[in-house]
């Protein structure tokens, strides 16, 4: 089944439950078709069936495909499946993430302890972005929203590894600002505080007598609807690009501004060089995009 040309299509990673599922529900409510990619196959199929049952008059608004975001073959299959099923991809909500192994400073000195968290939380976002951009560029543009976190601006010994991955997602998101001028693709990040999701449960179920659990148990929560509203703002407002949007307790949503540039890093001569460099690099990347599309087969 292929959607009509004016029908918007969204891809959601980690969409089987939690924030991803809530955003899928919001998108479907607006008539946007959704493809969920996840490794939780039972939950994924159940979520797709549940949302399809809610769509009166249209039996397939949501489809599911098994997706490991750390593998290019799975990510490519996800976006090609979305294109084959619904006609293209306009929106990508890159939400897949894990928190296990986050308190890693004194864990055993074993390689796998440090591998999985950044592999999913950072590399997964990078791989999905690269594939999403190609499909969106073919379609004339689109928008990507990454799930970062308030943790991307803070520090915590107890969850140091997790916090580091979310700092990386913030940096990656802001670094994609030029994509809008290259191929009309906007990239933003939603940065929630603690939500009552499965990931938070994983913290509370940590082994041992960790006093950090008490802090998490009593920490203020952000409502799921606040997070969803933030994601929808980033999708719908075409002026929002390379933006990091905090969603906080008390139904507060606000942009986390960047720090000011360090004046010591520039001179008048260097600033003039940067001004002349911008149009050159834009053309350079447009040519790289053409080569990437040819290489990918779009």
Which positions does each model-derived feature cover?
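Canonical Rossmann dinucleotide-binding motif of NAD(H)/NADP(H)-dependent dehydrogenases/reductases
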Residues: 2-35
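Residue(s) in the substrate-gating loop at a strand-loop-helix junction
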Residues: 149
């Amino acid at each position: 089944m292929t959607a009509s040309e004016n029908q918007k299509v969204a891809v959601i990673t980690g969409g089987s439950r939690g924030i991803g599922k809530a955003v899928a529900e919001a998108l479907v409510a607006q008539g946007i078709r959704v493809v969920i990619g996840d490794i939780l196959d039972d939950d994924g199929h159940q979520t797709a069936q549940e949302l399809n049952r809610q769509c009166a008059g249209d039996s397939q608004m949501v489809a599911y495909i098994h997706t490991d975001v750390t593998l290019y073959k799975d990510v490519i299959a996800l976006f090609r499946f979305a294109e084959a099923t619904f006609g293209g991809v306009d929106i990508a909500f890159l939400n897949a993430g894990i928190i296990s192994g986050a308190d890693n400073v004194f864990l055993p000195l074993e390689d796998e302890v440090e591998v999985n968290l950044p592999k999913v939380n950072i590399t997964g976002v990078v791989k999905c972005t690269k594939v999403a951009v190609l499909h969106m560029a073919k379609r004339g543009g689109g928008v990507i929203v990454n799930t970062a976190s308030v943790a991307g601006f803070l520090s915590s010994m107890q969850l140091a590894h997790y916090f580091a991955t979310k700092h990386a997602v913030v940096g990656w998101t802001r670094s994609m600002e030029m994509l809008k001028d290259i191929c009309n693709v906007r990239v933003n990040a939603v940065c929630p505080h603690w939500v009552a999701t499965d990931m938070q449960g994983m913290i509370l179920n940590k082994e041992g007598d960790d006093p950090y659990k008490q802090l998490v148990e009593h920490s203020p929560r952000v409502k799921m609807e606040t997070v969803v509203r933030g994601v929808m703002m980033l999708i719908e407002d075409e002026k929002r690009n390379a933006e990091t949007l905090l969603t906080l307790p008390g139904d507060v949503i606000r942009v986390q501004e960047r720090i000011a540039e360090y004046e010591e890093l520039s001179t008048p001569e260097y600033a003039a060089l940067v001004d002349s460099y911008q149009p050159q690099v834009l053309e350079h990347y447009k040519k790289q995009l053409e080569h990437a599309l040819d290489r990918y087969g779009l």
